[in-house]
Amino acid sequence: LVAVEPAFALKQFIEAQGGSVECRTDGAKLPPNNRSAYVGTAKIDDIDAAKFIQLIGTNPRLEAPVLNARIRKAWLMGAQIGLVGEAADLTYDYAHAGIDRAALQSLIGKDYRAVKDAASVVILGQGALCEPDGLEILAQAMQLAEDTGSKFMVLHTAAGRVGAMDVGAVTEGGIDAALASADVVYNLGADEVDVASGPFVIYQGSHGDQGAHRADIILPGAAYTEESGLFVNTEGRPQL
């Protein structure tokens, strides 16, 4: 949970020492140089007007309850919902295509003339992107959006991820490449990262979670409620 300004400051500081910075700490296969791929083209308001909504690899009821309420509202207004991924109680009915790659592939190449005539949204979750073939799933989801004339949205679950991607806090090869040869790890509020026993770890954050327990040095950090900063939301909009 890191705002844009400290993410950029960390990038400048670490890269000046010859190091690497990586914000995709869960291994999400998000391409750093394509904002339409790591954010998408849809706005949250597009959900309200959508007649067709396709969910891929996400449980929005758990990952984004407010957005899920918008999907439910659209469903109550007559929208048709589809899901590729684990079945769950999302508080609305949906057509479950399946849980595997074949289910997603089966949706591509169909006749979607009826869908193209109406507003529609394809929503891709982080669960799908964290798979080893996440880039292929992303490409298929974007292809489905193109086939159906839909807006495309990547549903982020890390509040600081989009802003950090925007300022280039990424390393080729992702988190594994960034940690592979590190002697010192500066962990800025990434509580879910599992750092091996070798590197010296400096942790700066506000929560005594996994990151703090692994640290050799802990530096104090303000919680997001105690500081001013920019966060970029899942639709790519900066918020104070």
Language model regions located:
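Short amphipathic alpha-helical coiled-coil/interface segments
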Residues: 7-10, 14, 141-145
